[in-house]
């Protein structure tokens, strides 16, 4: 509808110029917005006002010229009005909205899809938590955001590659090994002074007990450095296996788990730094190697190899991001915790230094989650230093509720997550509110089959469709027509919460309609038209939930 109206306005402006009613032939992009108030129409444009300087005319005169030359060959306009200094308000004929129902029934699960990506390849790297402990709630929000962004981009024509970067080569892995070894020594009866910089959680003791049961004799024969490395390897593998299971339970899978250690072992880090040194962006100073990130917009240069010969985490990140583009991705999206915001300029600098546009990298920063129970804060960590895990939250409220709530606000805003609210079977629970629409319509269709012998409603003629004339019905159809734009905007701006917001609006529209009107009536024609409408609602609810990674239950 919006595209049709934009074309009509563009044609009207051109016609007005050709007939001398306007002075310039070029016009800015035509923006159409849905007015806040119903009496301002279905769409409004400020084209006349933003064209005033070019046309050298009063905005209201421009608006009058455009309206006078509107050709409504499709018969979609009920009326137009010029408001205020030059806004043009468009009122769409109610029946002009109805064809969207046919599109939904024809496209089904593809309704709302587009070709925004044009088949280009995009890599979405998300979660990428260190294999030094279980995933916590913050990781869960990042996981939901990253996976939903990937789903939306794939739906909009991108070839999407999901990747988890395993940080298995840094000092944190040695610290993990030392932590486990010290806990193992405690199990063996040794007095141990456990350092504060070691990992404190009870999961470390659990791993130590397992190693003691399976590898005690071998460990007793090892020198300290070998024992640390052994414990680190066993612990990291076990933790990573747990992360994989937790993410699978959260309906998240990856195309690739990329090892940081592989970059070191294959010489990719060393080779990348050598090439950058040849180009002059990596230089030696004070016995260390520095990357001249300040040349690319960072506030200062960064160390990539310390004066003791040890590569920094940033060195691996440079090699990793170069590797991403070497694999042929047109675009790379990283999903990080908000505490990494200061890291963006240096990674952008690395992208520029390896010959890519910094715009080829998008970084999504995900803010923190505060857990609540009936409105009261829940302690996010125990005395032992363990954060509330994603697994614990998923086990308590379910993956669907967790994912929906994680996506219920823009990721750049902190999120309050009420565990009790997420379990309620009431309209106060947003995921229940949306899923119940799907389940209620499924129940309605079952009743239609049992009581009226009406099977799946797949086709309704236009005459029958025009029986949908109640204001709430037309409003519901208008909401359905908004879905493709919600999807394309979510893809364009990498904002999955737009889908969540849309689904809540659609659910509210359906609940309001259902409370006022019976779908299964004594009038067979009206019943068929209304079933056709609610089937479309059911399909769009299912489509939107799928983009969030949330199920659409047939019963609740």
From Swiss-Prot:
Coiled coil: none annotated. GO terms for biological process: arginyl-tRNA aminoacylation. The gene is argS. It is found in: Cytoplasm. Its EC number is 6.1.1.19. One of its GO terms (cellular component) is cytoplasm. It catalyses: tRNA(Arg) + L-arginine + ATP = L-arginyl-tRNA(Arg) + AMP + diphosphate. Keywords: Aminoacyl-tRNA synthetase, ATP-binding, Cytoplasm, Ligase, Nucleotide-binding, Protein biosynthesis. The keyword Cytoplasm applies. The lineage of its organism: Bacteria, Pseudomonadati, Thermodesulfobacteriota, Desulfobacteria, Desulfobacterales. InterPro entries: aa-tRNA-synth_I_CS, Arg-tRNA-ligase, Arg-tRNA-synth_N, Arg-tRNA-synth_N_sf, ArgRS_core, DALR_anticod-bd, Rossmann-like_a/b/a_fold, tRNAsynth_Ia_anticodon-bd. A motif ('HIGH' region) lies at residues 129-139. It comes from Desulfosudis oleivorans (strain DSM 6200 / JCM 39069 / Hxd3) (Desulfococcus oleovorans). This is Arginine--tRNA ligase. It comes from the Bacteria. Gene3D superfamilies: Arginyl tRNA synthetase N-terminal domain, HUPs, Isoleucyl-tRNA Synthetase, Domain 1. Pfam families: Arg_tRNA_synt_N, DALR_1, tRNA-synt_1d. Belongs to the class-I aminoacyl-tRNA synthetase family. Its main location: cytoplasm. SMART domains: Arg_tRNA_synt_N, DALR_1. Monomer. GO terms for molecular function: arginine-tRNA ligase activity; ATP binding.
